[in-house]
Amino acid sequence: MAEEQRWQEGCHRLCANNCGFFGSPATLDLCSKCYRDRQGRESTAPVVVAAAASACPATHPSSPSSSSCPAFLPSSTAAEAGVVVAAVAKASRCASCRKRVGLTGFACRCGGTFCGAHRYPERHACGFDFKAAGRDAIARANPLIKGDKLKDKI
């Protein structure tokens, strides 16, 4: 009975986006998913605005009405981001034999996705230099220590 009264008091509200889940006042009456989506949009918006500002040089700072920058620049950068997402989703085939790999694809350090038969570097003519990468990793992990040039330091 007390639980029904708490329900009717209005502490539980449906999400403001009408997705069917409950929102809370701490998340602006949004459910957790809608709130995360909104936070993601707000965090990427300054990046797009900054990219638009850097892409449009200010030729005449005294006359802001004669801007040569297109107003649709943020949508074009969003379209470029869509191209990147499409390229990532396109890697569902083996780079050597074009066989569908689905979820079992093996990503190589050369950047390709391969099936079980071509997953090893020797099998798909990998262009990645594993020896140089290993040398660089060892050089970063173990910096060269040089001794003092003056032997009789006071």
Swiss-Prot record:
Induction: By dehydration and salt stress. A zinc finger (A20-type) spans 9-43. It comes from the Eukaryota. Zn(2+) 1 binds at residues 15, 19, 31, 34. The keyword Zinc-finger applies. Zn(2+) 3 binds at residues 108, 110, 124, 126. Keywords: Metal-binding, Stress response, Zinc, Zinc-finger. Zn(2+) 2 binds at residues 94, 97, 115, 118. The keyword Coiled coil does not apply. A zinc finger (AN1-type) spans 88-134. One of its GO terms (molecular function) is zinc ion binding. May be involved in environmental stress response. This is Zinc finger A20 and AN1 domain-containing stress-associated protein 5. It comes from Oryza sativa subsp. japonica.
